[in-house]
From Swiss-Prot:
It comes from Saccharomyces cerevisiae (strain ATCC 204508 / S288c). The keyword Phosphoprotein applies. This is Uncharacterized protein YLR049C. The keyword Phosphoprotein applies. Residues 72-91 are annotated as: Disordered. Present with 339 molecules/cell in log phase SD medium.
Length: 428
C-alpha cells in the first residue's frame, strides 16, 4: 500500500501546473489554428497533461498542393476542396500512407505548369524528429530535477541533506542536459546537411534514368538516413530485381500468411502497392534465404558465421555462455537468426503507419541491391550487435520455451537502433 502511494505521488507544484494548463481536445478544436487541418473523429475526448502526448490524439490532414505555375511567384495554388485527401478517407477502406500516389509518386516533369499536378513536399526524417522531441522531453525533466534540488534547501522533504551530494547531483544533471542539447544540435546540423544534399539532387536530376541517382546516394551514404518520399519509389524500383516468380499467378499463395511479407505489405499500404511489397519480399528472401525459413541458408554464408559468433562472444560473453552451455543451443541458428527475423517483422508492424518502418526498408533494400554477401554481412554483424545492445538482458531465461517467447515478442526501439547504425556512417 505504501509503495503504491509513493509511486502515485505527484508534487504539489506539478499538480498546480497541470490544473492551470490542463487542456482537452475540445479546447484544441475551438482554436482557429487547428480549423480544417485536423481530423478530430478518431478517438474519444481525453484530458492531456503533457504536450508530448498531444500527437496521440489527433490525425493530421494531408492536403494536395498544386505545382506553382511557371509565371507565379512560387506560391502554390490553393487546393480544390473536392480533392482533399485525409489519412483515413471515408471513400477508401485502406489507410493512406507515404506510399500513396499523392505523396509518393514524383512528378516526372518537374517544370510542369499544370495546376492539377501535386507538389511533392519532402517528408522529414521521422525517426530523427521523434528522437529530438524525446531529447527535449528529457531536458525538461532534468531541469525540473534541478529546480527541485534548489527548492530542497527550504523544505523538510530533502532527499540528500549533505551539500556535497547535492552538488554532485547538480553537476551530473547539468552534464546530462548539456549532452542532450549537444545531441540535438548535431541532429539539427545533420538534417540541414541532408536537406541540402536532396535539394541539390532535385535540381540536378532531371532524367528518367535512376542509375546515376542510386550511385550518388550510395556514394554519399544518404540511404542510411531515410530516403525522401519523392525519391523512394524510383530508388526502390531501381534496386529491386524482377524475378520470374513474380509473374506466376499461383506462386505467391504459399507466402500469403508469411509474417514478414505481411509486415512489408502493411508498410507498403496493403493492396495499393501489392506488386511492390511482393518484389521487396522476394528480393530479400532470395538474398537472405534464412529470412523465409530457419532451415534455408546459403552455403557460402556459413563460413562467415564463425566471425559472427566470435563477435557475439566478444560483446555479450555472459549471454553466449548462457545460450551455449546452459540451454545447449546453436547460437547462430537458434538465436541470432530468429531474433533478426522476429525483430524485423515486429518493427515493421509497429511502425507501419508512421513512416519509420520505411527508413528500415530503405537500408535493407539498397543494401540488398549490392548482393547477398553485403546484406548478410550487415544483418549478421552490425545489425544484430546494435540490436542486442538494447535487449540482450531479456534472454537470460531458465528454459528454451521462455526463450522462444522472448524472441517472438522482441520489441526494441527502432529509432535508437537506426541512430546506432547511422552513428558509424559519415556523410561525405
Amino acid at each position: 500500500m505504501v509503495n503504491n502511494i509513493m509511486h502515485e505521488y505527484v508534487p504539489p507544484s506539478q499538480r498546480l501546473f497541470h490544473s492551470r494548463h490542463r487542456i482537452t481536445r475540445n479546447d484544441l478544436k475551438e482554436e482557429a489554428l487547428h480549423s480544417g487541418t485536423t481530423d478530430w473523429t478518431t478517438i474519444l475526448d481525453t484530458t492531456i497533461d503533457k504536450d508530448t502526448n498531444l500527437i496521440s490524439y489527433a490525425v493530421p490532414i494531408i492536403d494536395n498542393f498544386a505545382i506553382p505555375r511557371a509565371n507565379s511567384q512560387g506560391s502554390p495554388v490553393a487546393p480544390s476542396p473536392n480533392h482533399r485527401s485525409t489519412m483515413y478517407s471515408s471513400s477508401s477502406s485502406s489507410a493512406s500512407s507515404v506510399f500513396s500516389d499523392g505523396l509518393f509518386t514524383p512528378n516526372n516533369n518537374r517544370n510542369s505548369s499544370g495546376s492539377s499536378s501535386l507538389v511533392i513536399r519532402p517528408q522529414k526524417n521521422l525517426s530523427v524528429d521523434s528522437l529530438i522531441q524525446e531529447n527535449k522531453r528529457k531536458i525538461n525533466s532534468e531541469k525540473e530535477s534541478l529546480s527541485l534540488i534548489a527548492n530542497n534547501n527550504d523544505e523538510t522533504l530533502c532527499t540528500h541533506t549533505d551539500p556535497s551530494i547535492q552538488n554532485l547531483i547538480k553537476s551530473e544533471t547539468k552534464r546530462n542536459i548539456l549532452n542532450l542539447k549537444f545531441q540535438n544540435r548535431n541532429l539539427f546540423r545533420r538534417e540541414l546537411k541532408l536537406e541540402k544534399f536532396w535539394s541539390n539532387l532535385r535540381s540536378c536530376h532531371t532524367s528518367g534514368d535512376e542509375t546515376d541517382l542510386l550511385l550518388v546516394i550510395s556514394k554519399h551514404n544518404l540511404y542510411w538516413f531515410g530516403i525522401p518520399n519523392d525519391f523512394r519509389l524510383p530508388i526502390y524500383k531501381r534496386c529491386l530485381y524482377h524475378y520470374s516468380e513474380l509473374d506466376e499467378a499461383g506462386f505467391f499463395s504459399q507466402y500469403a500468411n508469411n509474417s514478414l511479407y505481411l509486415a512489408i505489405r502493411k508498410c507498403c499500404n496493403n493492396e495499393e502497392q501489392e506488386t511492390l511489397s511482393r518484389s521487396i519480399f522476394i528480393n530479400l528472401t532470395k538474398n537472405v534465404t534464412w529470412l523465409n525459413s530457419r532451415f534455408d541458408d546459403n552455403k557460402d554464408n556459413k563460413n562467415s558465421y564463425t566471425v559472427t559468433e566470435g563477435k557475439f562472444y566478444q560483446d555479450f560473453p555472459n549471454l553466449y555462455y548462457h545460450l551455449k552451455d546452459k540451454l545447449k543451443l546453436n547460437v547462430i541458428m537458434d538465436f541470432i537468426k530468429p531474433v533478426i527475423r522476429n525483430f524485423m517483422t515486429n518493427a515493421l508492424n509497429k511502425h507501419k503507419l508512421d513512416g519509420i518502418g520505411l527508413e528500415l526498408l530503405d537500408i535493407l533494400i539498397v543494401t540488398t541491391y549490392y548482393g547477398p554477401n553485403k546484406i548478410n554481412a550487415f544483418l549478421m554483424d552490425t545489425f544484430i550487435l546494435n540490436l542486442l545492445k538494447q535487449c540482450h538482458y531479456k534472454f537470460f531465461v531458465s528454459n528454451i520455451s521462455e526463450l522462444v517467447i522472448q524472441i517472438s515478442k522482441i520489441d526494441c526501439d527502432l529509432v535508437i537502433l537506426l541512430e546506432d547504425l547511422r552513428s558509424r556512417i559519415d556523410l561525405d
